[in-house]
């Protein structure tokens, strides 16, 4: 495809996949925020006030519901009695048993701090992409409880408080924060919570002296927000089952008790409502973000003015309990679960302010100490806020649609929202409060359904467009492969006037509909790619026909047809099994076990000739199969880190000892080559850097485990070792050794120190086994090609091309054949394994931050995330280098196999696109998002790996190249001698003539 050479194909691949990754956010996770709504609150007579004059919100960041309410031994026992399990939050527990109402607040994905706080305080669920905005100052630019309050005072983290302070009415919210340097994962995080409690005490001490402040604190409709980050930081550092985390719960409970008593002593009016909850939970491996139940279940304890007393069921199990709360010893107290956004509605009601404009929370009536009439009024106001959002959204949708399809329950056959609200008002006026509450609850569900209907209004059109786009990419990629790497550009594209008019008309029609609908700019991108891809495929239809003859021309008998169909079904089955492997990691183990027998399919003669190589492949596959059987959620294991690092050092030392054997393709018969002493010295330095990384990592890990912090010297040396090791390949340019095995070792040792520093358990062993598997794969594929080519006569499809004026490729590159599909499939499986063998496929959050603390102990999500990405990229770097060498050994173009994989990989992407969920269990939602994003990014990685591969193998020589060069030199000398002899004869003949 002369018009679209290789580098343009790669650029198109990257742009297309990045654009289409965001399609799930335009389809499934559109921001629900709207403006222009009227606000509603419960109207009361002048002589009646709100349930509470003030509200105190405690958010224990990262606190799991079970850990808060279970019984545990004393974290730091001083006597045998301390070993007896007891509640670690006795004050909060007393509120559950005596004064308030409790339950579990269920969060949504992503289970991160910003989305969690937005749901709690604004009552809405931001779209999933908003999680990244929580890592930088990005004001919450929509309505919230704080914005509705008369005034809000807040204390806590600089990552959370400024968002609400700067997003509210100027001067409405005061935020008191500690510095970012306090968020040190290597220090005692309880100091963060103690800082908050101490500053609240100082604040009220100042109020006793400051008359202006005291008057402000005596107003109604005020809110106090205490953000307690210590639990989250401790959970990340030590895990939520650790004594440090449990001790932090004790400190939080004591702090809440002291603050509650402070309010009681200061106000002495009993008009304060207290809410204690969390923004998200924490997984057993110290992370959050996905939809695992440990991350989505948080405690909710409410007590004080306007709050219902506990409902007790002595001697029996109270309603609301299940297996999850069986060990809390609270079975006799009714448990009232809520969705996280419901908390915002509850707090708004208690303090007597309007419900936030975009709130979708349902007011939990079971938490209210109100009579039935008050509950009926509150329910109606709650549903009016939802219906107001529906009205505004519907008006905007009508304005951009040629033919609007109304929501059926509110359509021609259903009652309008206004009519149904009027009916509920009549029920309240008639004193039929129970019926009014039931009707409000039913209308609430219909209203939320209407909001969802409008949210998903464009789904069918967009999903069809994206699907056609992905199918177009697959067809375009495979067409490009056939044109470039099978036909070598011999067939020119054939465009017709009719075809051009057709595709242009389709694009114009799509864009016209998008303009009328006032669609976002991203929609135009989604519409462009399908038309572009399918037009390219149509223009190269003759290439496809010629490619079919080249690739399938030899399939002309019943047996060959059956073999082709069977192999095709097998390959499709493997790809489908990889989709299941995203959920069940064990499937990758099965694939490796099956793949270990691949050399046996070539017969005994092949095994006899390549016995050692086949055995290496078999053992490497079996070893690789074990990693996906190990738990993805792993704790730090310094001994395993050390063992992995030592084995990396052993590999480097063995190479230095047996260099001649390795460079002779593992043969003892070859003559020893001249030693490149500079190159060997550099290998020794790389081995030394790996040893240094082991020492530093072990020291840093033990220091952090002992809670002694990260020594400054260790941090500096860790960075020096990491950077120096990554720069070492530049030194080899002084006197390069271009043998492919030497190049592979250099890359292996380049990444080894980084992998040691950033590993927490068995990942170092994976790095070793994975590297061994890749090397044996490169050698085995070459051996198979030589073996099969020596047995089978060459056909037109297998001959190496000669240089012709028609070919767009240089002579060394042979055309692809059907047999290369297996090589591409192996490459694809190895890509999946590179990511999944050490991580939980369903949860990106399973990649622990423990290793990053050895370099960056202070909370810095972008830098820490970059370190994790660097670690994840190392196996991909190994694959790219080995595949580049394999391309050379097989004689195919550098981009050929990359492009094949880029085409077939989106079969997985398209599958995961259709199974993305935005409702259901939070685990399902988070998993489907992760699956789609990972599958999409893998294709982007492949497109990026080709230039990486080219850089890694620049100038590298495989065995055949060296032999050809030597043969070429001999041939040149022979030709020179022949020419000299001929010239001598000619000149001799001429001289004789003259003399005569």
Swiss-Prot record:
Glycans are attached at residues 47, 147, 210. It is a multi-pass membrane protein. The chain crosses the membrane at residues 9-29, 464-484, 496-516, 519-539, 561-581, 587-607, 613-633, 638-658, 682-702, 716-734, 755-775, 823-843, 866-886, 896-916, 933-953. GO terms for biological process: cell wall organization; GPI anchor biosynthetic process. It comes from the Eukaryota. GO terms for molecular function: mannose-ethanolamine phosphotransferase activity. It is found in: Endoplasmic reticulum membrane. Coiled coil: none annotated. Residues 30-463, 517-518, 582-586, 634-637, 703-715, 776-822, 887-895, 954-996 are lumenal. InterPro entries: Alkaline_phosphatase_core_sf, GPI_EtnP_transferase_1, GPI_EtnP_transferase_1_C, PIGN_N, Sulfatase_N. Its EC number is 2.-.-.-. Its main location: endoplasmic reticulum. Pathway: Glycolipid biosynthesis; glycosylphosphatidylinositol-anchor biosynthesis. GO terms for cellular component: endoplasmic reticulum membrane. Residues 1-8, 485-495, 540-560, 608-612, 659-681, 735-754, 844-865, 917-932 are cytoplasmic. SUPFAM superfamilies: Alkaline phosphatase-like. Keywords: Cell wall biogenesis/degradation, Endoplasmic reticulum, Glycoprotein, GPI-anchor biosynthesis, Membrane, Transferase, Transmembrane, Transmembrane helix. Belongs to the PIGG/PIGN/PIGO family. PIGN subfamily. Ethanolamine phosphate transferase involved in glycosylphosphatidylinositol-anchor biosynthesis. Transfers ethanolamine phosphate to the first alpha-1,4-linked mannose of the glycosylphosphatidylinositol precursor of GPI-anchor. This is GPI ethanolamine phosphate transferase 1. It comes from Neurospora crassa (strain ATCC 24698 / 74-OR23-1A / CBS 708.71 / DSM 1257 / FGSC 987). The gene is mcd-4.
């Amino acid at each position: 495809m002369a018009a679209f050479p290789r580098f343009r194909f790669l650029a198109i691949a990257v742009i297309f996949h990045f654009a289409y990754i965001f399609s799930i956010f335009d389809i499934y996770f559109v921001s629900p925020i709207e403006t222009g709504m009227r606000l509603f609150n419960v109207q009361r007579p002048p002589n009646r006030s709100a349930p509470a004059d003030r509200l105190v919100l405690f958010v224990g960041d990262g606190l799991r519901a079970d850990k808060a309410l279970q019984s545990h031994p004393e974290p730091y026992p001083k006597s045998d009695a301390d070993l007896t399990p007891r509640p670690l939050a006795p004050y909060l527990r007393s509120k559950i048993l005596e004064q308030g109402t409790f339950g579990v607040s269920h969060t949504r994905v992503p289970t991160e701090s910003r989305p969690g706080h937005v749901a709690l305080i604004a009552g809405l669920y931001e779209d999933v992409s908003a999680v990244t905005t929580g890592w930088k100052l990005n004001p919450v630019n929509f309505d919230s409880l704080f914005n509705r309050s008369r005034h809000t005072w807040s204390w806590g983290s600089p990552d959370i408080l400024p968002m609400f302070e700067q997003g509210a009415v100027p001067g409405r919210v005061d935020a008191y924060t500690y510095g970012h340097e306090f968020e040190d994962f290597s220090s005692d995080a309880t100091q963060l919570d103690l800082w908050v409690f101490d500053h609240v005490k100082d604040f009220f001490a100042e109020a006793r002296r400051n008359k202006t402040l005291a008057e402000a604190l005596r107003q109604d409709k005020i809110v106090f927000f205490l953000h307690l980050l210590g639990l989250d930081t401790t959970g990340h550092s030590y895990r939520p089952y650790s004594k440090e985390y449990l001790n932090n719960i004790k400190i939080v409970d004591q702090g809440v008790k002291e603050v509650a008593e402070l309010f009681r002593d200061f106000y002495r009016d009993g008009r304060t409502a207290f809410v204690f909850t969390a923004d998200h939970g924490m997984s057993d491996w110290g992370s959050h973000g996905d939809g695992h139940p440990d991350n989505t279940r948080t405690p909710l304890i409410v007590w004080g003015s306007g709050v219902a007393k506990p409902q007790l069921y002595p001697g029996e199990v109270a309603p609301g309990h299940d297996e999850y709360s069986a060990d809390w010893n609270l079975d006799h107290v009714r448990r009232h679960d809520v969705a996280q956004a419901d908390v915002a509605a509850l707090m708004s009601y208690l303090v007597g302010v309007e419900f936030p404009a975009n709130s979708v929370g349902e007011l939990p009536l079971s938490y209210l100490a109100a009579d039935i009439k008050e509950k009926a009024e509150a329910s109606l106001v709650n549903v009016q806020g939802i219906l107001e959002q529906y009205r505004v959204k519907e008006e905007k949708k009508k304005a951009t649609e040629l033919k609007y399809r109304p929501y059926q329950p509110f359509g021609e056959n259903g009652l309008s929202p206004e009519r149904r609200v009027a009916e509920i008002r009549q029920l309240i006026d008639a004193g039929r409060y129970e019926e009014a509450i039931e009707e409000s609850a039913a209308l609430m569900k219909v209203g939320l359904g209407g909001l969802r209907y409008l949210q998903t209004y464009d789904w069918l059109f967009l999903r069809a467009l994206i699907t056609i786009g992905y199918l177009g990419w697959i067809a375009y990629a495979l067409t490009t492969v056939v044109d470039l790497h099978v036909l070598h550009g011999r067939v020119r594209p054939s465009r017709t006037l009719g075809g051009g008019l057709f595709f242009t008309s389709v694009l114009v029609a799509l864009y016209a509909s998008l303009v009328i609908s006032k669609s976002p700019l991203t929609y135009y991108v989604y519409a462009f790619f399908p038309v572009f891809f399918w037009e390219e495929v149509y223009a190269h239809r003759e290439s496809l026909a010629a490619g079919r003859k080249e690739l399938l021309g030899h399939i002309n008998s019943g047996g060959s047809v059956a073999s082709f169909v069977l192999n095709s079904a097998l390959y499709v089955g493997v790809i489908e099994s990889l989709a299941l492997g995203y959920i069940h990691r064990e499937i990758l183990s099965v694939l490796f076990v099956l793949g270990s027998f691949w050399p046996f399919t070539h017969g005994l003669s092949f095994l006899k000739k390549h016995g050692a190589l086949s055995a290496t492949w078999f053992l490497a596959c079996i070893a690789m199969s074990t990693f996906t059987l190990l738990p993805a959620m792993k704790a730090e294991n310094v001994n395993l880190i050390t063992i992995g690092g030592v084995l990396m050092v052993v590999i480097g030392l063995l190479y230095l000892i047996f260099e001649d054997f390795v460079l002779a393709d593992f043969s003892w018969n070859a003559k020893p080559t001249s030693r490149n002493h500079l190159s060997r010295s550099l290998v020794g330095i790389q081995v030394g850097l790996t040893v240094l990384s082991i020492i530093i990592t072990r020291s840093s890990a033990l220091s952090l485990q002992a809670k002694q912090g990260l020594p400054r010297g260790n941090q500096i040396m860790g960075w020096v070792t990491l950077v120096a090791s990554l720069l070492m390949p530049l030194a080899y340019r002084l006197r390069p050794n271009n043998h492919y095995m030497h190049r592979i070792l250099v890359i292996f040792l380049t990444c080894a120190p980084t992998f040691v520093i950033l590993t927490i358990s068995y990942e170092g062993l994976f790095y070793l086994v994975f590297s061994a598997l890749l090397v044996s794969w490169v050698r085995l594929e070459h051996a198979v090609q030589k073996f099969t080519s020596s047995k089978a006569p060459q056909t037109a499809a297998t001959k190496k091309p000669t240089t012709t004026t028609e070919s767009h490729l240089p002579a060394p590159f042979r055309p692809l054949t059907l047999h290369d599909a297996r090589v591409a499939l192996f490459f694809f499986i190895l890509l999946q394994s590179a990511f999944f063998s050490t991580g939980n496929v369903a949860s990106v959050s399973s990649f622990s931050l423990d290793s990053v603390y050895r370099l960056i102990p202070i909370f810095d999500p972008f830098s820490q995330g970059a370190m994790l990405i660097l670690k994840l990229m190392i196996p991909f770097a190994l694959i790219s280098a080995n595949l580049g060498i394999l391309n050379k050994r097989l004689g195919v173009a550098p981009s050929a196999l990359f492009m094949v994989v880029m085409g077939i990989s989106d079969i997985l992407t398209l599958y995961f696109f259709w199974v993305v969920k935005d409702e259901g269990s939070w685990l399902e939602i988070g998993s489907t998002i992760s699956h789609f994003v990972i599958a999409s990014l893998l294709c982007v990685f492949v497109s990026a790996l080709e230039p990486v591969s080219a850089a890694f193998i620049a100038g590298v020589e495989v065995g055949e190249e060296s032999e050809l060069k030597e043969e070429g030199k001999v041939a040149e000398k022979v030709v020179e001698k022949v020419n000299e002899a001929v010239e001598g004869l000619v000149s001799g003949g001429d001289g004789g003539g003259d003399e005569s």
